[in-house]
A protein has these predicted regions:
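Generic transmembrane alpha-helix signature in multi-pass membrane proteins
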Residues: 60-71, 171-172, 183-188, 208-223
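Interfacial segments of multi-pass membrane proteins
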Residues: 32-46, 172-173, 182-197
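Juxtamembrane transmembrane-helix boundary motif
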Residues: 1-17, 38, 44, 68-169, ...
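Membrane-embedded alpha-helical segments of transport systems
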Residues: 53-61, 83-87, 94, 205-212
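Alpha-helical transmembrane segments of multi-pass membrane proteins
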Residues: 9-14, 47-53, 198, 204
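Juxtamembrane transmembrane-helix termini in multi-pass membrane transport proteins
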Residues: 24-82
Length: 278
């Protein structure tokens, strides 16, 4: 395969990954890494390195818009980033010492989990209940704009959410994905933050977490510009288009189809990892 053909395939694949990732809320990494590893035979470490760069780029663009709209809770994001940034570096170090086959299997399992999370019914936790002591101490409670005016919300179980962020950060560094599903669980289910706030705050955090991982991958020489550049351009373009389509389109059926595709990719990666074909 020529360099030009490889670049074109990666560019088109990354565009579709960014488009579908934006429409379904999973991000492009869950598609682009299997494409590079399974489809094009790229070493899993280099596939992860390219994905991390694209995660930084896409998160930075959309995060700025959400912060400007006043939906993102920047204070919660920066507080939880203490856990995710430190653990992301731990994840990258772990990736150095375990076989690529194991990384592929873990990635497949996370894909399965993400597919289930994508179909999960969303619950809004907007509330004015009594908050936790730590939330008051760190001033994490907040508000966000809605069609019915500004809604106040209280933050709960701060330590539980912080612990979940450590797990999410480790997986982000290990696998090169945003681990948005785990971050949303930490903020939505554990800390009981409204879903819209948890998703936008997660998006804000993903770029910072990925940046910490990228520094280590760059130091190890596992970020190849020939792969990372078309991946980043494709994912950003696809994600931008997906965001515009999302406003006008119902994505329930698309999410079901995408969950099936992701499940297939997950099983394929798990099989390859267990059989030593990764």
């Amino acid at each position: 395969m020529t360099v030009l053909l490889f670049t074109l395939i990666v560019l088109v694949g990354a565009f579709l990954a960014g488009l579908l990732g934006s429409l379904t809320g999973l991000g492009g990494g869950v598609i682009i890494i299997p494409l590079l590893n399974l489809g094009l035979g790229v070493d899993i470490h280099y596939a992860i390195g390219a994905s991390i760069i694209s995660v930084i780029a896409t998160s930075s663009g959309s995060a700025a818009a959400y912060v400007k709209e006043g939906i993102t809770n920047v204070r919660i994001g920066m507080f939880l980033e203490i856990a995710t940034t430190a653990s992301a570096i731990v994840g990258v170090i772990i990736a150095t010492y375990i076989k690529a086959d194991y990384i592929v299997v873990i990635f497949g399992l996370i894909l399965l989990f993400s597919a289930v999370m994508m179909l999960r019914k969303k619950v809004d936790h907007s509330n004015n209940e009594q908050t936790s002591v730590l939330a008051n101490y760190f001033k994490l409670n907040g508000s966000y704009p809605t069609e019915d005016g500004v809604k106040q919300y209280a933050v709960h179980r701060v330590l539980g959410g912080f612990a979940m962020m450590f797990v999410a950060g480790t997986l982000s560094g290990l696998l090169g994905i945003g681990s948005g599903a785990l971050k949303v669980i930490g903020m939505d289910n554990i800390m009981r933050i409204p879903f819209k706030v948890s998703t936008t705050t997660s998006n804000f955090m993903i770029g910072v977490t990925a940046a910490a991982s990228a520094l280590v991958y760059l130091h190890k020489g596992q970020i190849d510009p020939m792969i990372a550049m078309p991946v980043t351009i494709g994912v950003i373009t696809g994600a931008t288009l997906g965001a515009k389509i999302l406003i006008k389109t119902k994505t329930d059926k698309l999410k079901v189809v995408f969950a099936i595709v992701v499940t297939f990719l997950a099983l394929q990666m798990i099989y390859n990892g267990l059989s030593g074909k990764a």
